[in-house]
């Protein structure tokens, strides 16, 4: 269990208790879900959320005594796991379109769907790399031979990278240089380990990684609106709603902002 924070989180605890009261009032039948003050919550989350959700989880655990277990991966792969019956309580995707897909299949609690953040992408290279760039068009230069992006077929940040390269008019020239990561964290690791010179990754990971990075203009790709929802099969709806509420609370928003959201 992550260590308990001080009483400065009392307002959050009050919020959680209020949500518990609302849930109890809605359903007079005997409750089978775990209350937000105890138990365990399993959250599937896109890889770009790793650092920020780990901090959110620590804060939430300390305030509620609900242990949060995270499963991080590419949004597409996590979506397929949910479709195949993975026992997640809440899913935070890197693009709300995947939440819409699950809603169409009747796999989420409809009123729990929400957009919680908008993502950005960056060019990232290691500090010791001799590569220098000012913008995405520089990736077409011959001295840059290997570029990593997340697989656009199942990773929203990879799709945004592909769209940006196409909009910049360099897709055809850089496509032979591309190395695809299964998710955005693996994509960053390719650049960190020197397997590629440059990676296109999320702003969140760039901020929290020791390297040089440049923002890619938002107008080069479709918005990365990140959505979440509670799974219809959850046995812990009360805690899942409390965690979702914490993400959008003033405290949660401050943490999200610190990580580039």
Identify the residue ranges that each predicted region occupies.
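Bacterial N-terminal signal peptides that target proteins for export
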Residues: 2-13
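C-terminal motif of bacterial Sec signal peptides marking the signal peptidase cleavage site
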Residues: 20-24
